[in-house]
Amino acid sequence: MSFLIVLAALAFLMLAAYRGYSVILFAPIAALGAVLLTDPGAVAPVFSGIFMEKLVGFVKLYFPVFLLGAVFGKLIEISGFSESIVVAAIRYIGRTRANAVIVLVCALLTYGGVSLFVVVFAVYPFAAELYRQSNIPKRLMPGAIALGAFSFTMDTLPGTPQIQNIIPTTFFKTTGWAAPWLGVIGSVAMLTAGLIYLEWRRRTVMATGEGYGGSAAEANAENQPKAPRSGLPHPLLSIAPLVLVGVVNYALTKMIPHWYGDNYALTADALPGLHSAINLPIKGVIGIWAVEGALLLGIVFVVVTAFGRVRAAFAEGTKAAVGGALLAAMNTASEYGFGGVIAALPGFLAVSSALKSVPDPLINAAVSVTTLAGITGSASGGMSIALAAMSDQFIRAAESAQIPLEVLHRVVSMASGGMDTLPHNGAVITLLAVTGLTHKQSYGEIFGITVIKTLAVFFVIAVYYLTGLV
């Protein structure tokens, strides 16, 4: 019975997400409903002592990353930098390679620190015009955007500032550059397989005589492709803040330990108002601080170099970015609190025991994380639930098998971006809404990319065991 309660809570949350209901509201309802069925008297203590503690802890650690990433992405958009990058990519790579152009631009923006949701809005108008001029069926476009924005630059390529690569740093005391060789190998494999798949789909569909086509939703003015604005910034200037974020992120990862050591004690000598000293283990925040510092410098760079363009839309743009960051952070934090509650239930012991039956530590972690990401429809949410419930188990198993925690970080991060893009995933729903397409028209290609992403993590595990590369 206790096992069925856990399954019911997970199924309820998945259904709520699929139906479009707010996870912020329904994650605590699902968690506390499970507690009510287990021990009615524990509902209030669990809510305050577990759910809210986990939620607040997540927000404390990660909200600045969500906020700075959203603001940076919005400034890249309103400055014209993202538009300039798209136009330059089309000019230099060519319209005949539409899939490669869109994948490259999306990858460049996400690896440079732009939120994947912002990338969808920024790239779509120009992607639509490119596909129209090349007479490539529009319904293939979401697959290309998914490969560029929702895959290797989100969780696999070393140093990516996306939250899916940052969350593991606090659990495993690693950095965003964990397991660089495995990350590069996994990224190349994912990109290569994805491009081959998309090109095969393009040839297959166009062989039937299908062209760009259209949809009823395209009548909506928001979804109409638009011509590039005049007077766009130079492409080299446009790409500079993305490069800056990557370079500063790497530099701070190396420099922060030298500045602060292993632990930093903040005492009343420095701040007389402190009632007691604050001891902060630095290793657990290196990855977060490095990304925050890099994004902050990226924001300053964009404001300074594109002040004329940014000034007019700065107030409204940053207001929208803050709203988006709050929503994204609270969604994931609620799922993290849900995971903490579920992990405390007796029924979860059965789940944990079943997962322990998978003897290999890396496969165990990969299956656990990607399954929960699929159930919740969220890479960061599924990973948060898994790590809230099983991170200690993962660490013990890896250390027992003498597997570096860097490898575990990379596997967990990649696994979170495996089955997350099922039909109820928020990014998938947003992508289809922005492009004016339906699941029936375009989810097939997105699912193909989902399969490639899921298989890639097991390919990387095999590479590690065969070569020992980290």
Give the label of every model feature segment.
Residues 63-69, 92-129, 329-337, 358-396:
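Hydrophobic alpha-helical transmembrane segments of multi-pass integral membrane proteins
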Residues 128-239, 427-464, 468:
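Membrane-core helix-loop-helix motifs of multi-pass transport proteins
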Residues 5-17, 28-37, 66-71, 106-110, ...:
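Hydrophobic core segments of alpha-helical transmembrane domains in multi-pass membrane transport
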Residues 96-109, 136-153, 179-184, 188, ...:
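Alpha-helical transmembrane segments of multi-pass membrane proteins
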Residues 6, 38, 181-317, 434-435, ...:
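Long, contiguous bundles of hydrophobic transmembrane helices that form the permeation core
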Residues 25-28, 48-83, 108, 281-347:
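Core transmembrane alpha-helical segments of multi-pass membrane transporters/permeases
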Residues 19-23, 59-62, 73-83, 109-122, ...:
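Short helix-coil transition sites and intra-membrane helix breaks within transmembrane domains
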Residues 70, 84-86, 117-130, 159-171, ...:
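Re-entrant/interfacial helical elements at transmembrane boundaries that shape
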